[in-house]
Amino acid sequence: KAMAADLQQSIAIQKALDDTKGFLAVTFNYSGYPMVRVLRRHVQEGTFGELKQIQIEFHSDGFIQAPEKMHPQAWRLVDGAIPTILLDLAVHVQHLSEFITGQIPLSVNADFHHFSIFDGIVDDAYLWAKFEKGMRASYWVSKTALGHRNGLRVRLFGEQASAEWYQEEPERLHIYGKDSVRMTYDRGNCYFKEEVRERFKPGHPAGFVEAFANLYNDIADALVMFRKKGQFQSPYVFGWQHAHDGLVMLDAAVQSNKTETWVEIN
């Protein structure tokens, strides 16, 4: 999940990396999905024009079933300085937002909730973010959304087009243009085919395990480069700085929830 539970742990990890000159790659596996990578390329190639907003939802109903049916792991039922649901889910949401748009949040507002029978934890949260270029973001993470299993959904809106990707249909990327033009791309007919690393031909869905496999393959390439040059560059492999920045954003969200105000991300 998250690289660390709080900023102090993250800084300790950085010190260990500096002392050992070590290699660190954090498993942000959702950007391993082929069509998420294709969406990123559409952003880079200007398909959407100026980006206006991104909405990401990541919700399930694991904490709102009948008591006898719920058996959550113990670590999910304890909140630290940063609520576990943020470390579990929102860390991936923040990563995807930056991965897809290339933009860094400047400030955050947050509203945390508790709806389940499990006392003392946050099990539902909204986060909103502002960005330097005027883009806005809306994030929702929840363990108490009845009817949803692991409903990761990304919606992106620009001045020229919008897009939607849903994890339960990972093969499809929907892009909507002006004049009601709607296009659906999959691994067999998408632009930027070089972004699609696949083990099965189109029609054989590349799901969750394949997304991990894509990332691990990229990490292996990055490790080979690191061993040769002492550093690595990869558009898909993220180390300490990216993971730490995500924790900084989540820490600011905690402060925002307490003060009920926008908090700048330093």
Q: Where are the regions that the model predicts?
A:
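Beta-strand-loop-alpha-helix segment that lines the small-molecule cofactor/substrate pocket
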Residues: 1-31, 46
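Residue-level signal for the nucleotide or nucleotide-sugar donor/cofactor binding architecture
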Residues: 8, 34, 88, 151, ...
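C-terminal helix-rich "cap/oligomerization" subdomain common to oxidoreductases
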Residues: 10-14, 19, 180, 218-266
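Predominantly a Rossmann-like dinucleotide-binding segment in NAD(P)-dependent oxidoreductases
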Residues: 22-25, 30-120, 126, 173, ...
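C-terminal glycine/acidic-rich active-site capping loop/insertion
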Residues: 29, 126, 131, 155, ...
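Glycine-rich, aromatic-lined ligand/substrate-binding cores of catalytic
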Residues: 102-108, 115-162, 167-171
